[in-house]
């Protein structure tokens, strides 16, 4: 069973987005696959797993949230890490992504992940294809 959704939360108000997420979780099963194409990743970041990031016809990343958080660290802080693959200025500091060499736990930020992948295409592909 496959369900393909293109920008499913586009134009929805906040209560409708919440209802959509609940429906996706309710009707997801082991024998079904839901493919969601979206630019509104914050609307769906708690229901997406695995994450596949494409660049035209090239798969840059195809990994579970567990694998991503094992290999990459997502940090919110006031100082930039020297091995940062991606960083973005936020009010009060930075969000940054760097290799998780200390095996620390962090919550995957899908927007930062997307930007880190596109900024470091070959490096990220290498990190995740050499499992």
Model regions and ranges:
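Catalytic Walker B motif of ABC-type/P-loop ATPase nucleotide-binding domains
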Residues: 3-7
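C-terminal coupling/interaction segments
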Residues: 86-131
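ABC transporter nucleotide-binding domain
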Residues: 19-35, 39-96
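Helix N-cap at the start of a conserved alpha-helix in ABC-type nucleotide-binding domains
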Residues: 14-16
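ABC ATPase nucleotide-binding domain "signature" loop
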Residues: 10-12
């Amino acid at each position: 069973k496959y369900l393909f959704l293109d920008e499913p939360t586009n134009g929805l108000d906040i209560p409708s987005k919440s209802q959509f997420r609940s429906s996706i979780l309710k009707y997801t099963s082991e024998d079904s696959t839901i493919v969601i194409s979206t630019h509104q990743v914050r609307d769906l970041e708690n229901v997406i797993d695995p994450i596949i990031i494409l660049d035209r016809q090239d798969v840059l990343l195809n990994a579970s949230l567990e694998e991503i958080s094992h290999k990459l660290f997502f940090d919110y802080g006031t100082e930039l890490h020297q091995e940062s693959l991606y960083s973005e200025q936020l009010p009060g500091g930075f969000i940054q992504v760097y290799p998780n060499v200390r095996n620390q736990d962090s919550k995957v930020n899908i927007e930062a992940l997307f930007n880190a992948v596109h900024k470091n295409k070959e490096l990220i592909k290498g990190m995740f294809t050499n499992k």
